[in-house]
Amino acid sequence: MYNAGNYDVIVIGAGHAGCEAALAAAKLGCRTLMLTISLESIAMMPCNPSIGGPAKGHLVREIDALGGIMGLNIDRSRIQIRRLNSGKGPAVRALRAQADKKLYQREMTLTLERQEHLDVKQAEVIRILTESGRVKGVLTRTGAYFACRAIVLTTGTYLRGRIIIGEVAYAGGPNGQFPAIELAASLKELGLRMGRFKTGTPPRVSGRSINWDKMTEQPGDPGPLRFSFWEEGPERPNVSCWLTHTNTTTHNIIKDNLHRAPLFSGLIEGKGPRYCPSIEDKVVRFADKPGHQIFLEPEGMGTEEWYVQGLSTSLPEDVQLAVLHSVPGLEQAEMMRPGYAIEYDYIDPTQLKASLECKHIAGLFTAGQINGTSGYEEAAAQGLVAGINAARLVREQEPLILRRDQAYIGVLIDDLVTRGVTEPYRLLTSRAEHRLLLREDNADLRLGRIGYEIGLLDEQRFRKLEAKEKAINDGLVYLGKQHVGGNNPKIQEIIVACGEPPLKGTTSLKDLMRRPRIKYQDLAAAGLVPELPPEIAAEIEMMVKYEGYIAKEKIQVERLAKLEARVLPADLNYSEIRGLSRESIDHLERVKPRSLGQALRIPGVTPADISVLLVYLEQKKREGAKACAG
């Protein structure tokens, strides 16, 4: 072993969590080191070549608002972008972009290599070194010792990674990478509770062998859509995806080979993701369905490789090929890579604080799939928070903890540290109680100021945010002050043209816009309101139309805030509190909630338990007051 250097923060892993963590820590002025098994695997997309979607797109926008990199990077490397759920309510509308995988990696690698205060090195970490319950450094396979004050673990699916294809299983990481065997053992030695999950990926096929005429084209949306609030980004191509379906023949091939499927033969032990099941799992679970959607997605502009979305599998290679050839358009498909399942270790996230720091190992933060989540976006969001808080720990500042009513990032982390995981966790809009407040469109308004205050968002971007806030507020004030009457034929013409009943009497433009079919652009076209940039006009319109619903959600948030404000001591011995059941005590001791609000969200803890805790806190408060008076 030799002393290889001294850093403030060391980030282990260079996936989507690691990239955000390393950049955040370095931007906040910490001397930061990123260590990865392979420099070629930085920001790798081993599964789907896309970023975004419902809840996931919200996360990307929030990362961007706080000063993270994912939104900017996908804008620079996307080859298609679409707005999903555009016909639904604003809470669930979301962007989704297809990425040029290699370009995404190149752009991210360059960003990391050029970042001040950040060193990027290729090395396999085999041990986390601690002293007196605090991290002190890491040891690599080649004997290098790097000292540090904080570590961010972002190991993805590498911990004791095991690749499974049919009857074949071997140690490995994603896309032919090496697994991290000794590091997993080191974490167990540190006393971390660990579990085993699995995920999978579909085969890739050559575009030259696909019969596109048998598929339905899925083009991207026109217009200036982007994830980042701060940069418009370069002009990017718009490459179509393609839709086809499995059929009875496909399903029969799978059913005839279930005895060879590791998912059913017992070869796979880890629990897989509920919301991204393999094709063999879908065929068994949804036996009555005649077919399942299959999307062909481009992997990039510089390759003929296509991703077969919806056909994730760990069936033997020969069965995978037969399955592919049964799908319309893929009869002659050349399989470039087989699908596979990968098993990996994760840690129980209830061992973490809301800052993503381990409760019993000071300075050790974890982010991404090691915490039991799935998805690039979930990983990146955790990485950003872990990187920020590692830097804040080094600088002796309070951690950044986002509330559930502030951000989807807050929902994600609170779910992990409070409820834990029994399967790979995927963020959904339905997991957020206040999703109308947490829209994709207002992420900058919600979080941009926080990003600026902690030091990630620069002055130029903050000034842009302030200008946007002012334009929105001015627009709302103008709409409230300006009144129109039903005796104005021009007004009536606009109203009728929009399909709304004629106006009777006088009303404000704000009340007029509350009508479902009347849009800001209709009033602007008639010269009744000033022309505004589309994103500002859309924000004003949304705030007007949903004002009542938003007000109700804010009242609910205020009610819950009272429970969040009642802090529970970290050293509270729940077994000493009379009235709590044994089950509740076990749950409370495992999670050690920071507040009554968090305690209420722990599975197995009832409202009656909260009442007991409330009485206990009041009793302790009175005893404390008496002691002071005496």
Curated annotation (Swiss-Prot):
PROSITE patterns: GIDA_1, GIDA_2. One of its GO terms (molecular function) is flavin adenine dinucleotide binding. Keywords: Cytoplasm, FAD, Flavoprotein, NAD, tRNA processing. GO terms for cellular component: cytosol. InterPro entries: FAD/NAD-bd_sf, GIDA_C_N, MnmG, MnmG-rel, MnmG-rel_CS, MnmG_C, MnmG_C_subdom, MnmG_C_subdom_sf. NAD(+) binds at residues 272-286. It comes from the Bacteria. Gene3D superfamilies: FAD/NAD(P)-binding domain, GidA associated domain, C-terminal subdomain, tRNA uridine 5-carboxymethylaminomethyl modification enzyme MnmG/GidA. GO terms for biological process: tRNA methylation; tRNA wobble uridine modification. Its cofactor is FAD. Its main location: cytoplasm. It is found in: Cytoplasm. SMART domains: GIDA_assoc_3. FAD binds at G13, A14, G15, H16, A17, G18. Pfam families: GIDA (PF01134), GIDA_C_1st (PF21680), SAM_GIDA_C (PF13932). The keyword tRNA processing applies. NAD-binding protein involved in the addition of a carboxymethylaminomethyl (cmnm) group at the wobble position (U34) of certain tRNAs, forming tRNA-cmnm(5)s(2)U34. Belongs to the MnmG family. Homodimer. Heterotetramer of two MnmE and two MnmG subunits. This is tRNA uridine 5-carboxymethylaminomethyl modification enzyme MnmG. It comes from Moorella thermoacetica (strain ATCC 39073 / JCM 9320).
